[in-house]
C-alpha cells in the first residue's frame, strides 16, 4: 500500500529540484553572448541547414533566410510560399532560461499561413535583438504591436517542419530532439489539444500571454527519410 505521506513530502522536493535546475540554466545564460557566437560562419552551410528542416519536396522550392547584420535576409527566393531558416535561441519564450543560449540552431520550415502570421514576429524580434533591445523592452514592444494589430494570432493551419538531424534545440535534448511538426495556435489552447496529457502524442509549450501556444507532434522519420528513434529513447526538449 502506498503511503500518501511520501508523496506529500517528495512533491515539494521535486518542485524545488525543478526550480533549481531552471535557476542553473538561467545562470548559465544570463545575458546575450557576443553576436558572433550566434552566427553560422559559412552562408552556404546556413542555407543547407535551413533546408534540412523539411523534405526536399518542400524545402527545395522554399524561400531561405539567413541571419544578416540587422536581421534575417533572403538568401534564396522561393516558389512555393514556404520559408526555411535556422532559428536562434531568442525564438524561445521571453522567460525561458535558454533565451540567450548561443548553441541553439533550430532548422525550421514554415508553411504559408505560418509565414504570414508567425514568422513576422520572430523576424521583428531578431531585429530587436541585433539592435541591442533588452528582454523587458522586447516584451513591451510585443505587447504594443499586438495592441495595434501589427502582430496577429496564428492563422488556422499554421505549422512548421523541424525534421533536421543536425539541429540543436536545447541543452536538455543535447541535439535535435525528435523530428516533429509544430502547430501554432492562439495563446492558452494547449489543453484543448490534449497537449502534455498522459500517453498523448502532442506536447505543448505555453509561454506568456503575449506569445502563441506551440504544439509539438513527433513524427517517424527525419527529412532525409531515415527512421527516427522512439520518443521514449530521447532526452527532453
Please place each PLM-identified region on the residue numbering:
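Bacterial N-terminal signal peptides
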Residues: 8-16
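Sec/Tat signal peptide C-region and signal peptidase I cleavage site
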Residues: 17-21
